[in-house]
Amino acid sequence: KLGSLLSYIKTNTSKNGTSVTGVDPTTLGVSTRTDGTTRAFTETILKDVIAKVFASGGTPSALFVSPTQKQVVSGFTGLAAQRYQVPTSGQATILSGADLYQSDFGVLQIVPNRFQRSRDALVLDPEYAALAYLRPFQTNDIAKVGDADKKQILAELTLEVRNEAAHGGAFDLS
C-alpha cells in the first residue's frame, strides 16, 4: 500500500474531535484522518502522545513540527531555562529555542519541517520507518546536443512504515 505518513498514524494520537470531526484513518495506508477543531499545543498533549507510543512498543526519538509549532515547543514551561556565563570580553548569547526534548521515555530531537502542516506534530521512531525502492536508481541516456551527452537519473521511492504503533501524532493544533 502506498500512502502518506498521516494515513499510517492511527493508534497513538491526540486529537480534538467527535465521531464526525478529528477522526483517525480507518484503513491504514489508504484513508487519511479528518481534521477536527484546532486547539492550543501544550506539553500535556505532547507527553500523552509520547507515553502512548512508548506503551505500544516504540522508542520515539524525533518530533517533527512546523516552524510555528517549533516556537510553541520551545516555549513549554517544562523546558529548563538555558543560560551561558558570558565572558567579560565576549558577546552575550540569548537562547530561546529548544532542539531536544527530554521526556520520561527518552530524548526526542525537535525537527522543524517547513513542508508540514502547522496543525500536526509527529512523534516518530525512525527505526520503524524507511525508504522503500519501487524502482532502484538507474541512469538513462536521453539526448545528445552537440558534444554534450545528457543523462537522466531515475528512481521511484516511497515511505515504508514498518510498525504503525511505533509512531504517534498530536493533531488539530492551532
Language-model segments: which ranges?
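Sequence/fold signature of self-assembling virion shell proteins
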Residues: 1-48, 58-59, 70-174
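Hydrophobic beta-strand segments of well-ordered beta-sheets in folded domains
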Residues: 60-65
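A short acidic-Thr-Gly-centered motif at the start of a beta-strand
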Residues: 53-56
